[in-house]
Amino acid sequence: SANLVGGTKMIVFGGWNGNDFFNDVYVLDLEIMAWSKPAVSGPAPSPRKGHCSILIGTNLVVHGGFWFNEENMKKAGGKHQGSALQECYLNDIRVLDTETFIWSRLRVSGSPPEHRYGHTMDVSGSDILLFGGWTRTSGARFKHEPTEESCDYFMIWSTDTMSWKKGKYIGNPPTSRFGHTSTAIGPHLLIFGGWEYTKA
């Protein structure tokens, strides 16, 4: 994930290069176009891909994602596939202070979204809006395996009450998808593209 901080720097966290998952942090100074790798401390998130990150003030908030290790791969190839997938999908929230580069854990009450990756999160006032993603649970309309599916969940995280709740809306909602993009403009959430697994 990549986020603009203060208009002059871009912070990159985590990702996957096709072989390895990462949880490192890099900073690009946009004024001199120079990369640096700051020394971070605190309880850092585990390596992951497909996570979301948003900036709230000077805090970088990271949610969800997906990771796989050798042990999970062995399980997924056998009778423990379901439990292996359960361990791979993430739902934690970590916060990085972009001034001190110290990680901390964040706990939010209410009914949190299912573990997922490929979703989007956007800031709208004091609310964080979450939509879609690829998850291991039931309830979505499109599946390619019994334990995995894209979804059309719309969740709201209130930073005032530090709690999750399911979003309510009228009209025709977007279809289930992951890998899409979204942005909040005023009272509107714009969603574009994505993948249902059956089609883009």
What is the predicted role of each segment?
Residues 1-200:
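Kelch-like beta-propeller repeat domains
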